[in-house]
């Protein structure tokens, strides 16, 4: 089978949870029988069922008997611990699946290879590392949180060709349309946005995402001298001094 093809399908599924699955990673899963996807799923929101569960549950009644003969593709190692949901590795074993293909090992302390070990101990053939770099990019926020113990930070600025980033007295637009669309996408997926007092005083930005289903980020403002007039700005924000 074309492992990369089906793993990329997992990536596509995983992205559907962007902005809602956090702080959990983005995970998609596909169950493949004889090069045909018979089930697929993704982790839709934090606290909800994991991708593997949704994938197996999505298999049509007429294909149920094919589950044990199918290969499960998932972009992150199935969990092996009881958290908000039962361990996915246990469900995979109980389903009779004999082959699992994984993109990335899960560095989370309670998983970190334990899911793979559990599968292998129960006779399941596991292959790991398919499109590994692409998987790391997909979940760069999660991997930074877990491995480096810090948030993943996007730094955004726009400047004119002669080095200016704005006007001290009035709002001006420097970013182009493509950049603004990208920023809307980023805002729909992050928990907080940090700006300085001058940005709020001059531009008075909403700092929101225009995506209808997005969870709006917490707006943070650096204002060490407490000069910001909170009654005259658009946003409800947290002020850092």
Identify the role of each PLM range:
Residues 10, 28, 79, 119, ...:
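Residue-level signal for inorganic ion chemistry
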Residues 111-112, 137-138, 229-232:
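Short, charged, surface-exposed secondary-structure boundary motifs
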Residues 31-134, 218:
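Zn2+-dependent cytidine deaminase-like catalytic core
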Residues 27-35, 157-158:
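Short beta-strand scaffold segments in enzyme catalytic cores
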Residues 2-22, 145:
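Short, basic/aromatic recognition patches
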Residues 23-26, 152-153:
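Short, small/polar residue-rich loop motifs at catalytic or cofactor-binding pockets
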Residues 144-145, 150, 154-241:
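Active-site ligand-binding patch in enzyme domains
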